[in-house]
UniProtKB/Swiss-Prot annotation:
Record bears the keyword Cytoplasm: yes
Biological function: Catalyzes a salvage reaction resulting in the formation of IMP that is energically less costly than de novo synthesis.
Protein known as: Hypoxanthine/guanine phosphoribosyltransferase
GO biological process: IMP salvage; purine ribonucleoside salvage
Chief localization: cytoplasm
Amino acid sequence: MKRLLENSLETCPIVKRGPYHYFIHPISDGVPLVEPELLRDVSTRVIKMIDTNVDKIVTAEAMGIPIVTAVSIATDIPYVIMRKREYLLEGEVPVHQETGYSKGELYLNGINKGDKVVILDDVISTGGTLVAIIRALKRAGADIKDVVCIIDRGQGKNIVEKETGYKVKTLVKIEVVDGKVKILE
């Protein structure tokens, strides 16, 4: 039996920008509408696959925020958001991020040496964001216990493991074929 996430992916709209086909989905884009049932399905599944004996959950701005909030509320684990804006706080860790479609800076605050963390994000495609997050957390002295992305599209999991040594857990693997999302696993 397919779950809510998989069903919603198979029916989501696809838009083409240049050579790239983007799937538009509530988990990855916050549009057209984020239904509480979908967020509950995703967060419940994430909680079952992560080490909950951690100090903090880390995500990148912006679409990891709804997911990390739901997981945080359900587990009582606080979370940290890697922001796209510099705050100039003591201990802030800047990191350059490059994906297949953008590049820029992320800034990590609120992580102390020895913090046990789970990384949680919405989509992995090129792996660029996760590689940047992992490097920033290692520079800050964090102990990374799990790395999780909801949707796997592309070769990002392999790239992250090759460049960082961390395996990325995902809920669903997809590809866009003939203008539709196809569930691979």
